[in-house]
C-alpha cells in the first residue's frame, strides 16, 4: 500500500497532456451504450404512460409524482457535470471549504418544502414569475424575472454544464467536441420534447442511481490509493508540482484546506460570507428557481413534496465525500498536472494558463479505474450532464410558454401552447450549440467558484423580492420592482467589472479596483441583499397598500385563508388550467389564465389526427402528445379548495426526519469548521 501513496511522475512524452492517449476500451463503450439504451427506454416508458396532451400534464407531470422520483430529480437537477468537475477541482485547489455550498443547500431545500411550497400551493401557481404577477399585480416584475431566468439558464447553467461535460467527452473519447455535444443535446432534447416533465423526472431518478453508484466506486478507489482519510491529510500538504518555483507561493496548498470556516478578511471563502452571503443565493436557487420548484409542484401532495425534499437533503451530504475529497486525492496522485503552478506548463497540460484543477475528477476516472468501470463513470458524467440539461430545457420552456408567450397571446389555445413549448426547446438547443465557442474561450481556473460568483451578483435581489413578498404583507409592486431593478443594476455593474478586470494569475500583480479586489463576492451578496431589502421596505411603506386579492393565500400568514368564491361561470366559459394538490382541474376563479379552446371549433387549433394525415405526421403528433383523433368533452369543473392539511402520522414522521437531517448537517458543520 505504501507504493500507492507515491505521486506518479508525468508521462514520458513530448507533451504534458493530462490525458496521454487514453481511449475507451470495447467494454467501456458497451457500458456507455447500455446506459443510453436504459435512458431511452425509461424516457419512452414515461412518455407512453404520462398524459402529455395538456399543459399541466406536460409541464407539471400531471401533479401526481410520489416522493422518491421528486427527490431524485431535485438532486439530479442540482448535481450536474459542473458539480463533478467544479467541486473536485476546487477541492484540489483550495480544500473542503467549497463543500459549504452543499451543506448550505441542505437547509435551503428543506426550507422549500416546509416554508415556501405551502405558499405556492395555496396560491396555485405553476411558475415563479406567475407568483410575483399574482402577488404584486401588473406584468413588469414577472416579465423582468422571466427574461432574467432565461438569461441565467442559457448563459450560465447550460454553458457551464456543457463545458464541464466537454472536458470528459473530448479528452477521454477523443471525439470532436461539436459532434459529441450535438449528439448529447439531440438525445436530451428528444425525450424532453416528447415526454415533458414526467419523462425528465423519471430519467432523473434513473440517472441519480447511476451517478451515486459510479461516484461511490471512484471514492473507494481514491481513498484506497492514498491510504484513507489520514493518508489524504498527511499527503495533501506535500502535493506540489515538481516544476514550481521555490521562491513563489503559487501552487502551495492552503494551510486551512481541511476547514470550512476561514479567515474573514484574507481567505478565499470568509466565514461571515458563508453564513450570510451564501444563504441568500442558496434560497434563490432552492426556493424560487423554476428548475427546482417545478419538481416539487409536480408532487401529488404536500407530504410527498416534503419527502422529496428530505431525500434530496440527505443526498446533499454526499458531495463532500463523493466529489470534494476525491478532488483532493487527485492532487496528491497527480501533482504535476492537477496542481501545476506555471502558466506555460498549465497551458500544455490542459490548455488553460489559469490552472488545471478542473481536470482532477476526469484524471481519477481515466487513471485509476479499470476497463468497464471507466465506462460506468463516463456514463455517470453523461448522466449528470443530461439530467441538468433536461431540467433546464423543460423549465425554460415552461417559463417562456407560461409567462412570455401567454402574455403576448393571452387567448392562445392549449394546442398552441404545447407546440410553442416544444419548439422553444429546440431553440434552446440551437443557442446552446452556438454558445460553445464562448464557453471554451471563457473557462476559468475554478469552474465552481466562477458559477457561485456570478450567482452572487444576480440572484440576491430576486431572492429578497420573493422573501418580502412571502413574509411581509405590506410589500407592494412599486417597492418590489424598485428593489429588484436597483439590485440587478448594482449586480450587473459588479459582474461587468469582474469581466473587465479579470483576476490576475498568482505570479502577476493585482491592480484591480478596490471594489473588485477587496470586496469578496459573498460580501457583495450581503451588501446587495441589504440594499434590495431597504429599497423594498422604504418604497412599499410610502406607497399604497396591496389589495386583499394580492395577499390572500399568497403569503405565509394568509396561506390558510378560504378561496374566494365567485359567481358561477356560464357553461360556455372555457376551462382554465390550475395546479392542485391531487391533480384535479380547478375552477377558473382560482386558476392561472391559460385558456383552452374546444379543438373542434377551429381548424387553427386542429382536430387531432384525422384519416387524411400520413403515417409520418401521425408519428410526429404522437411524439408531441397530440395524437387524439376525437374530441373529448370537457369535464365539469367544480370549485376545489386546495388543502394544505396532512395526515398527522405522516406529518410527524416527516418533521422528525427533518430534525434528524438538520442535526446531521450541523454535526458536519461543527466537525469540519
Swiss-Prot record:
Keywords: Apoptosis, Cell membrane, Ion transport, Membrane, Sodium, Sodium transport, Sugar transport, Symport, Transmembrane, Transmembrane helix, Transport. Residues 1-27, 89-102, 170-180, 230-272, 330-375, 440-446, 501-521 are extracellular. MI transport activity inhibited by D-chiro-inositol (DCI), phlorizin (Pz) and sodium (Na(+)). Insulin increases D-chiro-inositol uptake. GO terms for biological process: apoptotic process; myo-inositol transport; sodium ion transport. Pfam families: SSF. One of its GO terms (molecular function) is symporter activity. Belongs to the sodium:solute symporter (SSF) (TC 2.A.21) family. This is Sodium/myo-inositol cotransporter 2. The chain crosses the membrane at residues 28-48, 66-88, 103-123, 149-169, 181-201, 209-229, 273-293, 309-329, 376-396, 419-439, 447-467, 480-500, 522-542, 653-673. GO terms for cellular component: apical plasma membrane; plasma membrane. It is found in: Membrane; Apical cell membrane. Involved in the sodium-dependent cotransport of myo-inositol (MI) with a Na(+):MI stoichiometry of 2:1. Exclusively responsible for apical MI transport and absorption in intestine. Can also transport D-chiro-inositol (DCI) but not L-fucose. Exhibits stereospecific cotransport of both D-glucose and D-xylose. May induce apoptosis through the TNF-alpha, PDCD1 pathway. May play a role in the regulation of MI concentration in serum, involving reabsorption in at least the proximal tubule of the kidney. It catalyses: myo-inositol(out) + 2 Na(+)(out) = myo-inositol(in) + 2 Na(+)(in); 1D-chiro-inositol(out) + 2 Na(+)(out) = 1D-chiro-inositol(in) + 2 Na(+)(in); D-glucose(out) + 2 Na(+)(out) = D-glucose(in) + 2 Na(+)(in); D-xylose(out) + 2 Na(+)(out) = D-xylose(in) + 2 Na(+)(in). The gene is Slc5a11. It comes from Mus musculus. It is a multi-pass membrane protein. Residues 49-65, 124-148, 202-208, 294-308, 397-418, 468-479, 543-652 are cytoplasmic. The keyword Ion transport applies.
